[in-house]
Amino acid sequence: IFKTNIIEEEESRVRQFLNLFKEILKVDFDFEDRDNVLRIETVGDITSHVEIMLNSNGYFCKELL
């Protein structure tokens, strides 16, 4: 689960980035949450890879602990 600054209008673009990870099984956004939560289900731990991918494309993305 990640805190992001992704807005609903950018969801499609972000999904394209996330589709590059074959380890991701499911992606869900919660734009009503103040943290614009991104939830992903994966095979294995790719947390840092997701953060790096989104951060390098101009988005804030940090795992919620």
Whereabouts are the PLM-identified features?
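Short acidic amphipathic segments
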Residues: 18, 24-30
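Residue-level signal for inorganic ion chemistry
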Residues: 38
